[in-house]
Amino acid sequence: NVKAVWEHVKGHEEVYGAEALYRAFLCDPQTQTYFAGKDLSENSAFLHSHGKKVMCALTNAIAHIDDIDGCMSKLSDKHAHELMVDPGNFDILAHHILTVLAMFLSQLLTCANHRSVDKFLSCVKNVLTSRYR
């Protein structure tokens, strides 16, 4: 399940998050729009810092899995109203997070665990996009 997989993410949030963001920026350049003037190169301090923030937010959501909406409410407001992030970018990032987990945790990412993580990321995406309506 997602909690079991995420136990192996803990302590590696910066590495996994930076890799997922780097892949998103490289494969889907439109995601770079919100980071004008930032160094988005593979080893940049910004990329590693922001990647860690993203993965730590997901770690927090898992810790509050019964109330993802409540725990991600402020992030949802920020992304919708302040940053005005295109909601489609959450799908893109979720895809790259799954890719990174498959790279680093291939033995753990069975079909059932893949489905569990994918469902969790979909729930998070739904919460983050709920303020757009």
UniProtKB/Swiss-Prot annotation:
One of its GO terms (cellular component) is blood microparticle. O2 binds at residue 50. GO terms for molecular function: haptoglobin binding; heme binding; metal ion binding; organic acid binding; oxygen binding; oxygen carrier activity; peroxidase activity. It comes from the Eukaryota. The keyword Transport applies. One of its GO terms (biological process) is hydrogen peroxide catabolic process. CDD domains: Hb-alpha-like. Red blood cells. Residues 1-133 form the Globin domain. SUPFAM superfamilies: Globin-like (SSF46458). Gene3D superfamilies: Globins (1.10.490.10). Involved in oxygen transport from the lung to the various peripheral tissues. Minor hemoglobin is a heterotetramer of two alpha-2 chains and two beta-2 chains. Belongs to the globin family. This is Hemoglobin subunit alpha-2. It comes from Pleurodeles waltl. The lineage of its organism: Eukaryota, Metazoa, Chordata, Craniata, Vertebrata.
